[in-house]
Amino acid sequence: MFKLRVLVLVFFSVFSLGAVFPPMSGTAIEKYIQKKLKHNDKILRINEKNLGDAGLAVLAQSPSVRSVTTLVLYKVHISDEGIRALAESPNLKNLEALYLEHNFITDKGVEIIASSETFSNLKILNLYHNGITDEGAKAIANSDTLTQLIELNLNYNQIKGPGAIELTHSEKLRQLHNIQLAYNPIEKTGKQAWKRFQLMESFKDLHRNNRLNQVGQALIGSFGVMVLLDFPFVSELETLDLRNNDLTDEAVIALSQSEKLKSLVS
C-alpha cells in the first residue's frame, strides 16, 4: 500500500508540475531542427523541449536556420545567456518574428535583444511570461535596432509603470501598433498611458478604413472622449454617436467647447 501511494504521488507530481527532461544533445537538436523545417523552412517552432542556453547556442550556429523568418521558442528553459547566443548568430538575419514565451529572460536579455543588429528586421517580439521589469521595457522603447516592430507582447511580466509609459511614448518605435501588457502590476499612470495608446491605435485603424464616424460604437467612455479630442483627424468627424458611453460632465463640456468638431452634422 505504501509503495502504491508513493507511485501515485510521483505520477501526480510529474503531470501536475511538469517533468523536466535531460537537456537535448547538440546532435539531437540539429536533427530536430532539420525535421521541423522539412515542410516549411521559414518557420521553426520548438515547444516544451529542454533546449537550455547551450542548446540555443547550437541552434544559433546551425546553418539550417538561415531561411527562418519566424522562430518560436516556447518553454525551452532558456535565459539571458541563450539570448546572447541568438544575438551573436550569423544565421538569423532574416528573422521577422521572435516568440520567447514562458522562459527565464530578464532585463539583461532584453537589453541584448534591443541592441543586436540580428534583430533589426523584427516585426513581432513576444516575451510573454518572463522576468522583465520596467528597465527591460525602457530598453525596447529606446532601441535604435527594433525600429521595425509592429507588435510587442509583454504580458505576464513585472512592469509597474515607467516602462509602460516609455513604450507608449517611444519616438524610436514608430511602427509599433500593438502593445500587450496584461497581467503586469502596472500602476495607474502606466495603465492610463497604455489605455491611451490602445485608443489612439483604434482611432487610427478606423480612420485608415474610412470608418471614423463609427468611433462612438466602441463605448470609449469619458477617458476615450478626451483622447479622441487629441486625435489628429478628429476634425474630420461628421457624426458622433456616444449613446451608452456614460460620459462625465467634464467630457460633455470638453465636447461642447471643442473647436475641432465644427464639421459635425449629428
What spans do the regions from the language model cover?
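Inter-repeat linker/turn residues at the boundaries of leucine-rich repeats
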Residues: H39, P63-R66, P90-K93, E117-S120, ...
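A detector of tandem-repeat and repeat-rich interaction/domain scaffolds
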Residues: T70, A85, P90, E96-A97, ...
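Conserved hydrophobic beta-strand positions in leucine-rich repeat
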Residues: L44-I46, T69-L73, L95-L100, L122-L127, ...
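LRR N-terminal entry segment and analogous cap-like coil->beta motifs
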Residues: F21-A87, E101, R208-T239, D246
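Leucine-rich repeat
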Residues: S25-Q34, G52-Q61, S79-E88, D107-S115, ...
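Sec-dependent N-terminal signal peptides
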Residues: R5-F15
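A charged, solvent-exposed segment within the mature domains of Sec-exported extracytoplasmic proteins
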Residues: E117-Y183, E187
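Consensus "Asn ladder" position of solenoid repeat domains
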Residues: K49, V76, N103, L127-N130, ...
